[in-house]
Design a protein with these regions (language model features):
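Hydrophobic alpha-helical bundle signature of multipass membrane enzymes
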Residues: 1-96, 111-117, 122-134
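Membrane-embedded catalytic cores of phosphoryl/pyrophosphoryl-handling enzymes
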Residues: 94-193
Length: 193
């Protein structure tokens, strides 16, 4: 079923240059936009003197790193070849032969989307939709199987749930304590509240 769904999506490639370009853009560049949004939330926290924004941005980066480490561990245990290794596919974005499972692009974008939920619910919804398009694009361009993307989302939803339930408030409080000490020591107190 994984291969059938892969073929269904990947066979859409190389039929329309505009759609191919959009999928390549989502696959290659949208993850950087997600990172930039997180940095912007942090900068807004400085400019508007809102510690909560800085905490949210830090917490989002923290859970994203945790999820990427989980991916690294899974990839080192379960190597899954990319679709183009054993089959002829419509490969729009060349990639090395590193393990395909789970998708780092899907993991990173969904981690950021869910992490920024406390900042702005509408932004979270928009970024979640964009993350799903990123995941779809990874299959469309020939770099991932659908299961790589779907299971990446499952991992992110599970870790985010646990993180929000047990760790998020502790991480944000620790950030606040460290920030206050650093800003006092570095005399940047005027930049913060």
């Amino acid at each position: 079923m994984n291969m059938e769904l892969f073929r269904l999506i990947n066979n859409l490639a190389n039929k329309n240059g505009v759609i191919d370009g959009i999928m390549i853009f989502f696959s290659n560049y949208v993850p950087y936009i997600f990172m930039a949004v997180t940095v912007i939330v942090f900068i807004l926290g400085i400019k508007q003197k809102k510690c909560e924004y800085r905490e949210i941005a830090f917490s989002t980066i923290f859970i994203t790193i945790i999820n990427m480490i989980i991916n690294l561990i899974i990839r080192s245990i379960f190597h899954v070849d990319r679709p183009f290794i054993h089959s002829k596919v419509n490969l729009l974005v060349p990639h090395d032969a590193a393990s395909s499972f789970p998708s780092n692009h899907a993991t990173g974008t969904m981690s950021i989307a869910l992490g920024l939920e406390k900042y702005n619910k509408t932004l979270e919804v928009i970024m979640t939709i964009l993350s799903i398009i990123v995941g779809f694009s990874r299959v469309y361009v020939g770099d991932h199987y659908p299961a790589d993307v779907i299971l990446a989302y499952v991992i992110v939803f599970a870790t985010s749930y646990f993180y929000n339930l047990k760790l998020r408030s502790k991480v944000e409080n620790l950030y606040k304590i460290v920030e206050k000490k650093m800003t006092t020591k570095l005399r940047f107190k005027s930049l913060y509240n």
